[in-house]
């Protein structure tokens, strides 16, 4: 009888709770899909801003003092 109670608890309480948590991921996925439409230049600017780098040097003139973006 105890085993049946545990099985019922798992399927009636824990399983629905686990499936409801999956719904919370949808806004993040939708945001990621919208970000795929950003041009490569805009994407690079977003990444550089997040990393704290404001300017890119030309790869031909790059020395050890700058971070190249190309």
Swiss-Prot record:
Top-level taxon: Eukaryota
Broad class of where this protein is predominantly found: secreted
Cellular location(s): Secreted
Pfam families given in the database record: Conotoxin (PF02950)
Propeptide residue interval(s): 25-54
Record has Disulfide bond as a keyword: yes
One GO location term (cellular component): extracellular region
GO molecular function: ion channel inhibitor activity; toxin activity
Disulphide bridges, residue numbers: 56-66, 57-68, 62-69
Residues making up the signal peptide according to the UniProt record: 1-24
Tissue: Expressed by the venom duct.
Similarity field: Belongs to the conotoxin M superfamily.
Domain notes: The cysteine framework is III (CC-C-C-CC).
Protein name: Conotoxin TsMLKM-011
Source organism: Conus tessulatus (Tessellate cone)
